[in-house]
Amino acid sequence: VKSTQKRGFVVSRPVAWKPPGLTGYLNMFNDGLSYMGVVESVTLPKLTRKLEKYRGGGMPGSVSIDLGLDDDALSLEWTLGGLPDIELWAQYASPGADSVPLRFTGSYQRDDTGAISAVEVVMRGRHKEYDGGENKQGESGTTKISTECTYYQLTIDGKEVIEIDVINMVMKVDGVDRLAEHRKAIGL
């Protein structure tokens, strides 16, 4: 149900149901290097907000005050089959908070029409953890990489949906930079 507001009241009208897009294929790029056939799974950042409850005098309930991104809002986990290549190991303890460029690409297919959507998430950050897991003779094993990102850009079918740049104080949602006035107010 889609809602619109008229004279202070919310009016609901039915919206045609669409089945979810299912992941068709995915790939991960690390500093331009493709991990096709090697990457097994990707857990993209959750984009969580840090909210604090506030209840002032005369308020019958509390409201959530938005304090920006949660500390783990831009955390990424990705799993590779086998032992990672030297290029990935060389990024361990990278000196810059945004020194590792990553790119996730995925294709999602709708079940009703068969239409395919291209999804791209561009991220920059530094690796926090390399988890080699358990290794057994005769098995390929996996390595899980945890990356703390400072930059995140979500694009769906060529349209930028979200861009977050922690270092440069940018937060664009559907083309609107929600921090532009704050940057202006502090002289940036």
Model features per residue range: what roles?
Residues 56-62, 87, 123-134:
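Short acidic (Asp/Glu) patches
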Residues 80-84, 106-112, 125-129, 149-154:
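Beta-strand elements of well-folded, non-transmembrane domains
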Residues 64, 90-92, 109, 130-137:
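Catalytic micro-motifs at enzyme active sites that drive phosphoryl/nucleotidyl and oxygen chemistry
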Residues 45-73:
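N-terminal interaction modules that seed assembly of large macromolecular complexes
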Residues 2-53, 181-188:
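Polar/acidic, low-complexity leader/linker segments enriched in S/T/G and N/D
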Residues 64-84, 139-152:
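Oligomerization/assembly interface segments of phage tail-like spikes and tubes
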Residues 91-121:
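Short, acidic/charged, Gly/Pro-enriched secondary-structure junctions
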Residues 126-188:
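Mixed-charge, glycine-accented linear interaction segment located at domain edges/termini
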